[in-house]
Regions:
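Conserved Class I SAM-dependent methyltransferase catalytic core
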Residues: 48-113, 117-122
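Core alpha/beta nucleotide-donor-binding catalytic domains of modification enzymes
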Residues: 1-63, 73-77, 82-85
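Generic structural "secondary-structure junction" signal
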Residues: 9-12, 37, 46, 74-78, ...
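Residue-level signal for pocket-adjacent positions within structured domains
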Residues: 2, 30, 39, 46, ...
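Generic N-terminal simple sequence motifs
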Residues: 26-27, 60, 107, 127, ...
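S-adenosyl-L-methionine-dependent DNA methyltransferase catalytic core
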Residues: 90, 116-171
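A structure-centric signal for secondary-structure junctions around beta-strands
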Residues: 4, 22, 113-116, 141
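Short, surface-exposed, polar/charged, turn-prone segments marking secondary-structure boundaries
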Residues: 31, 52-56, 94-97, 128-130, ...
Length: 171
């Protein structure tokens, strides 16, 4: 189940408590505007930067074997690592070991240069290592060169391919 909305308006116990022990992995990421390099960062004074505590509460209620949390890279370094340390401490108290770092989608075959902080947690054991970069440079051209050219106003929700795939990525 995916919840799209403001987690602060939910009754966490009512929403997630009944899922305890039935979910293997919780995947999500708290809002990151306060950590973003775009615009002014107020980090320690921005209440949005503490929404990770709701994520921790959900993990505590659901009690999954694993969790994966993602955010902007500054989550790990803001305020001298304060937030990273806080996250580590909270999850360690729940019995989770952590592995974390910054991954770039382009290192895993995605035609996008997108760096994200990733935190993986495992309950009662060593957290899995982050995946090793595979660095197979996929360009936007590799991904979409077989799409038809459209003029303004043309097209529909679905359309047949007009050209054969030119790259392994398109296949």
């Amino acid at each position: 189940k995916m919840i799209v909305g403001d987690i602060t308006s939910l009754d966490l116990e009512d929403t997630f408590g009944k899922l305890a022990g039935t979910i293997d992995v919780v995947i999500g990421g708290p809002p990151c505007q306060g950590f973003s390099q775009k615009g002014q960062r107020k980090t320690i004074h921005d209440e949005r930067n503490f929404l990770f505590k709701y994520y921790v509460s959900v993990v505590e209620l659901v009690n999954p074997k694993y969790f994966v949390m993602e955010n902007v890279p500054n989550l790990l370094t803001a305020e001298g690592g304060y937030f990273r340390h806080e996250i580590e401490e909270l999850f360690n108290k729940l019995g989770y070991s952590l592995e974390y770092g910054v991954l770039n989608a382009s290192d895993y075959g995605v035609p996008q240069n997108r760096r994200r902080a990733v935190i993986i947690g495992k309950l009662n054991g060593d957290a899995p290592k982050l995946p090793v970069p595979k660095r197979n440079d996929v360009t936007i051209w590799d991904a979409i060169s077989d799409l038809a050219y459209l003029e303004s106003g043309e097209g529909s929700e679905e359309q047949e391919y007009k050209y054969p795939a030119e790259s392994d990525y398109e296949k």
